[in-house]
A protein has these predicted regions:
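Internal alpha-helical transmembrane segments
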Residues: 1-34, 183
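Alpha-helical transmembrane segments of multi-pass membrane transporters/translocases
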Residues: 12-23, 27-28, 253-261, 316-367, ...
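Central hydrophobic cores of alpha-helical transmembrane segments
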Residues: 17-20, 272-285, 303-304
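Secretory targeting signals
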Residues: 23-56, 100, 108, 112-166, ...
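Long, solvent-exposed extracytoplasmic domains/loops
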Residues: 52-128
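Short helix-to-coil transition segments within interhelical loops
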Residues: 176-182
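C-terminal motif of bacterial Sec signal peptides marking the signal peptidase cleavage site
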Residues: 385-387
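Short, low-complexity, disordered segments immediately C-terminal to signal peptides
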Residues: 390-403
Length: 417
């Protein structure tokens, strides 16, 4: 209870958590832009067609869209011809208005059709795992793979003072002589991890609620390949499963970063060094390395990003030569499991070293010294028994002048014990 009060109140941990959630929400609302602006701009027209073809691309929906494309193309051509005829005086104004009304009915949902037709062309490339759906909500929630700087800064502010505050006022010397030093460090670890998890889960739920209200998150059981960002993915997961898995990876990445910061603070024992090392371990790879390299490093950063663990190969094409270049190579499941296992091992090792560095040194030495007297007593007992056994065997060699004494000694050894 004391450690909770110390971290959350005296070190302003609770204030940082609330501030992160508040700023994170404000930043989310202010910076969000729809991935497909036309889908939002012509939402009603798009939904009119989506209701007819929603879900798996069947032969019927494909035929319907192709026929609709021909019908709209003919209407556009007829509209242009009608306008020219009117200006040339070939038709009257009444005839022009009458024909224009009929053409207008065909072109009523034209803008929405262009959006659905582009989605249709994407779906046809691999109809088995690409479905028709509103993509802006899910793309905003899953796509992008960018670092949440608000959460990152919140973790830095929450974790850094936990041990550095004790080193700054030289409380570490007192803790090392206390019986509760190791227990106190364990409580700090658990409290910090709980606070970090609270921030991550809250931000994840806020994002889900925001995109659900603004765009909608329908059809969570559709394949993740329905989003163009995951077009080349070989992972057989749904949209909602992708949200859960990415969220779990980000949770682990946040915990990994928190443990790394505490480990650095125990080694460096200074605020500035801990903050700088924590920032460098995330910012430098994020800015200076390609995603292909980042997602293969046992660092917190790839897990904080999370998204591209489920993306396929991303290829860019040169506009002049037509040559293709792989910008990002897909992370296979085995690679992900190996990277995760190594990272978990590093977390456990760092946590163990943190606990050991804050354990009572005198008690650790005393435990080793307690074994010395025990071994000495056992050794003395063994030597005594060995010595007595030798005396019993040497009776036959005692001179005759000492015969009474030897008999007395023999009688003593024959007595029941």
């Amino acid at each position: 209870m004391y450690e909770i009060k110390k971290i959350m109140l005296h070190q302003k941990g609770l204030c940082y958590i609330v501030l992160v959630l508040l700023l994170g929400t404000i930043w989310l609302v202010a910076s969000d832009n729809p991935y497909n602006s036309a889908m939002e701009q012509y939402k009603s027209e798009y939904e009119w067609y989506l209701d007819k073809v929603n879900g798996y691309c069947t032969d019927e929906s494909s035929l319907y869209l192709e026929q609709e494309a021909e019908r709209i193309a003919e209407a556009k051509g007829k509209k242009s011809y009608l306008l020219e005829s009117y200006y040339d005086g070939k038709i009257s104004e009444s005839e022009y208005k009458k024909e224009s009304q009929e053409i207008g009915k065909v072109l009523e949902h034209q803008n929405g059709f262009e959006v659905i037709y582009q989605q249709y062309l994407y779906t046809c490339e691999n109809a088995k795992n690409r479905y028709f759906l509103q993509t802006n909500g899910w793309t905003g929630l899953l796509g992008g793979g960018t670092l949440n700087f608000v959460l990152f800064l919140g973790i830095l502010l929450l974790v850094t003072p936990v041990f550095c505050s004790e080193y700054s006022c030289q409380m570490d010397a007192l803790i090392l002589t206390s019986k509760e030093g190791r227990k106190s460090s364990l409580h700090k670890l658990l409290i910090v991890i709980s606070g970090v998890l609270l921030m991550c889960v809250s931000i994840s739920l806020i994002e889900y609620g925001f995109y659900s209200l603004k765009y909608g998150l329908p059809n969570g059981n559709y394949p993740i390949q329905s989003l163009s960002y995951f077009a080349g993915s070989n992972k057989s997961i749904t949209l909602f499963e992708g949200y859960v898995y990415i969220g779990l990876l980000r949770l682990f990445g946040s915990v990994f970063l928190a443990i790394l910061l505490m480990f650095i603070s125990v080694l460096a024992k200074k605020y500035a060094v801990t903050l700088l090392a924590g920032a460098v371990s995330v910012i430098i790879p994020y800015v200076g390395l390609s995603k292909t390299i980042i997602y293969r490093l046992p660092l917190p950063l790839p897990f904080l990003l999370g998204t591209d663990f489920f993306a396929g190969d991303i290829v860019s094409r040169d506009a002049f030569t037509g040559d293709e270049k792989i910008v990002f190579a897909e992370i296979h499941t085995i690679t992900l499991l190996i990277l995760f296992s190594v990272s978990v091992f590093l977390c456990i090792l760092a946590a163990a070293l943190i606990l050991r560095s804050n354990s009572n040194k005198w008690q650790m030495k005393t435990r080793k010294m307690r074994n010395v007297p025990t071994l000495a007593i056992i050794l003395s007992f063994v030597l005594t028994m060995t010595g007595c056994s030798d005396n019993g065997k040497s009776q036959n060699f005692i001179p005759a002048s000492n015969e009474p004494s030897s008999r007395a000694c023999a009688d003593i050894w024959r007595m029941p014990r």
